[in-house]
Amino acid sequence: MAGWFELSKSSDNQFRFVLKAGNGETILTSELYTSKASAEKGIASVRSNSPQEERYEKKTASNGKFYFNLKAANHQIIGSSQMYATAQSRETGIASVKANGTSQTVKDNT
């Protein structure tokens, strides 16, 4: 099964989206947006930037866990991954975002 985006609204009226892999696992989480339209633009940005290797910023947290940020051409963070135990599992996560990030399916939960 192909991946999809889920768009949601928080209790304080902010919006965010997550990218889900075909197995339902969240593989990318957006920043908070003040409007639904801005969150939808963020989804469009994932679609255009996720296939490009140079858009992935690989990081190590202070606790030694590995994660990545997907960035737009203007270097703004579009979304962040979960924490991974190994650098190799982070690479698998990046591959999953590349494979699922162009999905046209959006489940609107707002």
From Swiss-Prot:
UniProt KW Repeat keyword: yes
Sequence repeat coordinates: 10-58, 61-109
Coiled coil: none
Signal peptide residues on this chain, from the entry's feature table: none
One Pfam family cited in the UniProt record for this chain: DUF1508
Annotated InterPro entries: DUF1508, UPF0339_domain, YegP-like_sf
Keywords assigned: Repeat
Annotated family: Belongs to the UPF0339 family. Duplicated subfamily.
Protein name as it appears in the record: UPF0339 protein YegP
Organism from which the protein derives: Shigella flexneri
Classification lineage: Bacteria, Pseudomonadati, Pseudomonadota, Gammaproteobacteria, Enterobacterales
Gene: yegP
